[in-house]
Amino acid sequence: MRLAIVAGEASGDLLGASLIRALKRSVPDLQVEGVGGPLMRDAGCRCLHDADELAVMGIVEVLAELPRLLRLRRGLVKHWRDDPPNVFVGVDAPDFNLGLERKLRRKGIKTVQFVSPSVWAWRQRRVHKIARSTDLVLCLLPFEKAFYDRYDVPAVFVGHPLADEIPLYLDQSEHRRKLGLPENGQVIAVLPGSRRGELKRLGADFAGTIGWLASR
């Protein structure tokens, strides 16, 4: 069996790697190729392109990179049209993957979208594009399946892989000791995300805010 997969940025690489490992436990001889990062490579994916090539944020940046992204997508369509996989999985990155899925589906290739766009929160009309593009949506959140059921879009709730790795309840004192934090006092977690572009643009603002909070 041969799987094609495309993930953008670090979070998609993490999810894609967990999916590949899970599938290989059931299908040991599974062949995987596509777009991914170091975690997906370690899980056994032959990467045609690196996930960082899709990690573009901001209107100006996207417009500047649009010709390159369209060329990349056309190249993937041609590659998999000429040598079709059994299944294609798009991991998040809906602006890139849904268009790719639609083109591949027209060629008779089964397509899966892993991670639903936030259609339940905004731009709900995208659900019709999703219905045209994919044979199945793998949902991280339980209420997402109920949303797709209303539109007769096949969907399955699979949960988030990190839920299997991080306990629901943590010993606060133990983890404070591990992190070298005082037993008492307030702790604020700063989570800037995984996109390099966002870190580059907003890193100084995060650092300034942390310094301001620490001085209060």
Regions found by a protein language model. Name each.
Residues 1, 186:
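Nucleotide donor/acceptor-binding cores
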Residues 210-216:
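Short, intrinsically disordered, charge-balanced linker/junction segments flanking boundaries
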